[in-house]
């Protein structure tokens, strides 16, 4: 039987190596954990430094930039960034075709040029204002030229104000766009010393900036065109609707009409004379008399009151607007009552002379034998 002491010694010798091996495994695990913690701490410090860049002053940023540029590992960093970019960056098209101009922007430009707001000369627009003013007159020479000149001057003044505001805002837009573009280009050139940036990429970024700013330019031109159209509708279009003839021209035409109430059909010579005095065309004189005869027939009572009013003016004194007045001692049909509706010499249905009316078309004048004498 073996000695117990020897057995204990033998057992202790065999247990010793096992205890040593367990202690070595624990040390390796602790070393790996420490390396992992140190690595995470380094990453956290790097992220903290990156986050603090926005809070740095300009002097601190310049100092760190200088330190980076002078670092001995900067070429290696730039080389690694180039390799990463070649693997991950999207390829830029080699053929960068220019985009066609925006059709809406072209329409706005054409309208601004036509109205005299835009163009090579910032003080232009006189021709557009003159043509618009001429169109508002309907091709006729108005007697109240002073009023027209005042309205045209107001229109030109408002148009000049719109043009001035447009060019001021356009200059601000161009200045802001150029400043922002220059800032981005300088920033990209500065960053190209650290990370790879090609000139084509800078040019593409400039195009993106200009495209973003073009929406502001379109809004400016759109609002300017709307202002010009509102100005035209207020001054020229409204004026064209409300002013067919001046007050003086209406006086001349009404006086002739009621002075020749028995035969309100002026001859061609009389039409030419009336057109010359009123500053309108012969066709406008003919249209006015046609409309006047229709209104007279529809409302004979009111027309008779108007005729008596002109007769009173005639009795008070000769009007400076009248045609050649009758010689002294002769009667005038101004005070005569209105002829019956069947003797006006026209019918509403046929649009011409009635063969049974007291107007002799074959003689081209008035037949006194067929008409009742209306003289007092």
From Swiss-Prot:
PROSITE patterns: HOMEOBOX_1, HOMEOBOX_2, PBC. Residues 127-237 are annotated as: PBC-B. It is found in: Nucleus. Residues 38-237 form the PBC domain. The keyword Phosphoprotein does not apply. Residues 16-35, 318-376 are annotated as: Disordered. One of its GO terms (cellular component) is transcription regulator complex. Residues 318-335 have a biased composition (Low complexity). One of its GO terms (molecular function) is cis-regulatory region sequence-specific DNA binding. Residues 45-124 are annotated as: PBC-A. Keywords: Developmental protein, DNA-binding, Homeobox, Nucleus, Transcription, Transcription regulation. One of its GO terms (biological process) is animal organ morphogenesis. PANTHER family: HOMEOBOX PROTEIN TRANSCRIPTION FACTORS. Interacts with Ubx and hth. Belongs to the TALE/PBX homeobox family. This is Homeobox protein extradenticle. It comes from Drosophila pseudoobscura pseudoobscura (Fruit fly). The lineage of its organism: Eukaryota, Metazoa, Ecdysozoa, Arthropoda, Hexapoda. The gene is exd.
């Amino acid at each position: 039987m073996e000695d117990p002491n020897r057995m204990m010694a033998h057992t202790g010798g065999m247990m010793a190596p096992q205890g040593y091996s367990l202690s070595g495994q624990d040390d390796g695990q602790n070393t790996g954990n420490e390396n992992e913690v140190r690595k995470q701490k380094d990453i956290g410090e790097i992220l903290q430094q990156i986050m603090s860049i926005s809070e740095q002053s300009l002097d601190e940023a310049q100092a760190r930039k200088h330190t980076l540029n002078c670092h001995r590992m900067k070429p290696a960093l730039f080389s690694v960034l180039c390799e990463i970019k070649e693997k991950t960056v999207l390829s830029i098209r080699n053929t960068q075709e220019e985009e066609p101009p925006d059709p809406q922007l072209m329409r706005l430009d054409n309208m601004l040029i036509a109205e005299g707001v835009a163009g090579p000369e910032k003080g232009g627009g006189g021709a557009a204002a003159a043509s618009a003013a001429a169109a508002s007159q309907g091709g006729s020479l108005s007697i109240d030229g002073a009023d027209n000149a005042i309205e045209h001057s107001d229109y030109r003044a408002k148009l000049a104000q719109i043009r001035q505001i447009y060019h001021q805002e356009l200059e601000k837009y161009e200045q802001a766009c150029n400043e922002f573009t220059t800032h981005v280009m300088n920033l990209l050139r500065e960053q190209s010393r650290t990370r790879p940036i090609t000139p084509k990429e800078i040019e593409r970024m400039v195009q993106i900036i200009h495209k973003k700013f073009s929406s502001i330019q379109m809004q400016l031109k759109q609002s300017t065109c709307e202002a010009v159209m509102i100005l035209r509708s207020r001054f020229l279009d409204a004026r064209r609707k409300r002013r067919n003839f001046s007050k003086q021209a209406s006086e001349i035409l009404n006086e002739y009409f009621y002075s020749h109430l028995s035969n309100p059909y002026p001859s061609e010579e009389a039409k030419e004379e009336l057109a010359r005095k009123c500053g309108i065309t012969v066709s406008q004189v003919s249209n006015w008399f046609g409309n006047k005869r229709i209104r007279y027939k529809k409302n004979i009572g009111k027309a008779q009151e108007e005729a008596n009013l002109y007769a009173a003016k005639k009795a008070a004194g000769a009007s400076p607007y009248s045609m050649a007045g009758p010689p002294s001692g002769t009667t005038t049909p101004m005070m005569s009552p209105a002829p019956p509706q069947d003797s006006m010499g026209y019918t509403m249905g046929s649009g011409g002379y009635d063969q049974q009316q007291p107007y002799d078309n074959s003689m081209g004048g008035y037949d006194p034998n067929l008409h009742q004498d209306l003289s007092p």
